[in-house]
C-alpha cells in the first residue's frame, strides 16, 4: 500500500510548476500500477495549449470554473466541479481557467514525475 499526503509532495521533484499550472504528482511510473495520478492547479485567468500525443489523460474538476476547447473542431465545454473530460484521442486542446481550477488528472502511460510541457504542449515519454 502507498499512502502520501500533499505535504509529502510539495517542494520535491514530484511537484512541477509551469507558467499557468502546477502539478502535484501522487502516483507515478515507479509505483508500477500502469497510470499516474496528479493534483493539478490551473491559475485563474490563464489559457494553456496542451497536446498529450504520448499519453491518454482523464481530468476531473474539483474546484473552480473554466472551459476546454478541442483545437481541431473548436468545440468548447464548460468546466466546473463535478465535470470530467477524457483526451482519448490525444486531443490537442486549450484549457482556459476563469477562476483558479483544481483538477485530478490520471495519465496512461504513467508519468515519471519530472515531465513539463515542451514548445508543442507535449509531455515527452520518459523512462526512469
UniProtKB/Swiss-Prot annotation:
Reactions this protein catalyses: (2S)-4-acetamido-2-aminobutanoate = L-ectoine + H2O
Q: Which UniProt keywords apply?
A: Lyase
Q: Which InterPro entries match?
A: Ectoine_synth, RmlC-like_jellyroll, RmlC_Cupin_sf
Q: Does the keyword Membrane apply?
A: no
What pathway annotation does it carry?
Amine and polyamine biosynthesis; ectoine biosynthesis; L-ectoine from L-aspartate 4-semialdehyde: step 3/3
State the EC number(s): 4.2.1.108
Q: Does the record carry Lyase as a key word?
A: yes
What's any GO biological process attached to this entry? ectoine biosynthetic process
Note the Pfam families from the entry.
Answer: Ectoine_synth
- The enzyme's first-digit EC class, named in words, is lyase
What name does this protein carry? L-ectoine synthase
